């Protein structure tokens, strides 16, 4: 966002991440503050934390959500299940979301390469009448290549299903099962790893992304 001309300040707790922010060029007292002070100064508060951290930090954020501000999320969990998380925003602010379909690291890398990562967006609450404009501007600002509309609830459930079901669940389970099966049948750790993780991540997935599964099946040697 800073590279795209937005006036960005960072709110960060003291610790290793705070020190990393300083090393990355954020200046204490100018562009780097405590979470409380950053929320007080900001007109758009971007809550870019894990689900558990959002819940723990919410009491610090909420008092600074004054009328006309925008509360921005990159994931719909806290709002979708706010009866359990306790994250209930005041009615006189905008509540918006842009959810990149990938990691923050991927988003940054693609931006530096001149590419964009697809993102979904949603508006939960439009108190100012400008929530849509704010959302689209921020979506472009973070480096989205394409934006498609969703809701907080749909984003939260699809993200959890994808990550816990396939992306962080099934894939890891399949790779581990194949690796262990090969090892049980006498294959070396190197061979088992290369026939499992290495071939998938370094060879097949780039082809899958570029050409699709029909091409993969048509060109499979086995």
Stretches with model-predicted labels:
Residues 1-29:
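NAD(P)+-binding Rossmann beta1-loop-alpha1 motif at the extreme N-terminus of oxidoreductases
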Residues 2, 19-22, 136, 140, ...:
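Class I S-adenosyl-L-methionine
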Residues 7, 27, 44, 145, ...:
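Residue-level detector of anion-binding/catalytic polar loops
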Residues 13, 24-80, 88-103:
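Rossmann-like NAD(P)-binding element
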Residues 18, 38, 54, 189-193:
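Small-residue helix-packing motif on alpha-helices
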Residues 72-164:
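Rossmann-fold dinucleotide-binding core
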Residues 141, 147-222:
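Helical "substrate-binding/catalytic lid" subdomain
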